[in-house]
Structure formats: C-alpha cells, structure tokens
Amino acid sequence: MKKILFVAMQNSPHTIRWILQAQSEEWEVHLFPISQYPLHPDMPSWVKVHHPWKIARASFGSGFLTSPIVTGNILLAYLSSLFNFRQRIPILSSLMLFLVDSFRSSLGVAGNTSPIAYGPFVLSQLIKNLKPDLIQSLEFQHAGYCVYAARGLIDAKLFPKWMGTVWGSDILYYRNIPNHLVQIKQLLSSLDIFSCECKRDIDFARELGFTGVFSPVMPDAGSVDISNLKQWRDLIVPSKRRIILIRGYQSFSGRALTALDALEICQERLHGYRILVYSASNEVKQRVKELSLSTSIDIHILSHITPYAMLRLFARARLFIGISVSDGISRSMIEAMAMGAFPIQTDTSCCEEWIIDGVNGYSVPVDDIEVISEKIQSALANNAMVDNASRMNLALIDERLNNETLTRRALEFYRASLGLC
C-alpha cells in the first residue's frame, strides 16, 4: 500500500483539517511531529504518529522516558547511541519538555532550529525505514526546513516525492529576510510539488525558482460546514447585530494595536456596540484596559474561548476586523464571512481573492489608521451593504469551501501524485 508521510505541527488544528482531507483506503497516512508537544486532541486514530519515544505516566504522577526497540519503523538508533538508555529511565514529568528542548539541531542557513529528537537526522532515519511514496511538509519555516535538511542526509535517488505546503506568511513575509530568502529558494528548488492557499504564492514560487508541479489552490485550514452553522448564523440579521470582533494578535505579523487605534478615532460612532478582542497579546490586553478606562468604548478581552463558541460569536457580530502585515487566507476572516459578519481585513493577506472591496467586505492598508477608521464607520452606517455582503459571502464560502468539493479535489490530486490514476 502507498504511504504518505506528513511532517507538520502536530498540535495545530490546521494540520488536523488538512490530514482529514487525505483519508483514503488507498494509502496509509503517517505523521512525523516537529516538536515534543502533545498531539492535537482531534488527531485521527488512523494516522500513525512517529514519536522518537513514548511517554507513559505512572500512577503516582511521575513519568517515564521509554526507549523503543530500534526496528525498521522506529527512530531512536541515534538517540539511543547518544544517551545509552535501556528500557526505562524515570524522569520528572515537569522536566520532560525542558530536557527534550535543550538539545537542538540546525535547520539550515536561516538559523531556525528544532529539538534534536524531532530534527533532520531522526526524520532521515524514518524516511529510510518507512520508505514513504510522498512526503508533505505543512508549513515552510519549521516543517519544510526540517525536510530539506533531512533530504541532505539521504541519497537523492532514494528520496521520495516531496510536496511543500505554504502557510500564511511563509513566503510573503520571510522572503524579505536575507537568510530566509536563501533557504526558501533552496527549498523551492528541491520540491516536486508546490501547494498553497493563495494564488499570489504561485507567482512568488515561480519568481524564486520553483519549476515543478502546482497542486490545486486550497485553504490550509480546510473546509467550512455551512449546513451545521446555519442554525446559529440566521438567528440575527447582520445589520441588527451589536458586536464587533477584533483578532488580537500583536506579533511579527499581527497588528491588533492598529485596529484599536482606529476604533479610538471613531469612538463616538461605537455607542451601543460591544467590542470583543480575542487571542489578545499582552500589549493588546493593556491597550484594551486603557481604552476601557479612558474612553466611552465598551471593550472587553475574550479569554479561553472554544472554536465552536467563537463561531457562535461570529454569528452575533456585525463586523470582524483583522489587521496584519502578512497573512494567507485568514481562517478568522473565512469564519466571519461564513457566519454573516462583515470582514475588514488588511490587503497584506490574500483577502482580495475573496473580497470585492466595498461589496462583501473591505480590504484596508495595514498602516493607515484613518482609512481603517473610515471603513469601520462606513460598515456601521450602511445596513444594506452589510446584509447583502452576508448573503454573498455565504454563497461564496459554500461554493469554495464545502467539504465534499475540497475533499474530492484533494483525493484526486493525491491519487495523481501517488500514480494511482
């Protein structure tokens, strides 16, 4: 039977959604995690996960670092030789992550590293023993770089077909950093298949030297099940909703503080609306506190909200605001559109592949607070635009992101890549 080996962030919901699209009786699905952290709770049981060791817990709360028998499908010949451990070495559970993370491998000229136990050498041993027919790395700067480094440890004639999948800012942002640009070019020149969620990344890949096969453009975060969401979506007409949701990332790419500054400018127009900020960084939390004390804005931080609760909030929101210097298809924007919230998203994502500016959303510059504020006020004033956008976006999401369509396209491409059709 054919084998697909995913190299990916094992705790990411994006990984889960992608792998679910690859389920088939025609091949086995394997996963090499890129770190020592736990699997996402929704990881399918039919995925064979290749950890370099297994962690077992004793009844009294301590843990054990268990050395597997080194066979054709287990990875630890290297670590066994380093640490010379036998069957079980007791170790405090609280120290496990620290110890594993302390020994790191280089992933190349960009300067990224990985835990040595989940690094290129161990991955190369798995590839040699498992002999997958296709490797798919989900994301470039960790998973992709790790596969590229492992590739250098294996005879090129024995290395399997490799599909590299771009996430979010993998090329758009990192191509502006010299060392990353070098490594992105190296990676692209080694790929057989390039996978992305934004059409713009196809052009970037060509410009940077990719000459292989392009997979169908598909969202990294998977499908949206409209049929199960309508029960929440249709409870309140968008123009009657009184919640504004803001994605609270302030990071190398997130710019939630810019969104908050734009709200402060139009605070008089926000009377009667509640502003909710989710996934807030520490500086964003501080800024929200300042706005709450110094202005009339009714603004709050959302903490520890589940994905389903988030969807229900989108169904009660009039506006969604996502500001970032770099992104792919924002999952938050997609979910907002699916639930009827009017999206205001920066043009540094590929939102323009989804939004007709001023029709079913607004595409705004990341650094122009005045423009962002004007678009917020416009979306609050124009009830007809918001309601019409809701209907248009529902049809758009259902057309592009329904599970049946995406799964069929994914399976057809996997079959072709594995030589099954």
Give residue ranges: language-model regions.
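A short, well-ordered alpha-helix in the C-terminal region of glycosyltransferases
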Residues: V371, S378, M385-R400, L406-E412, ...
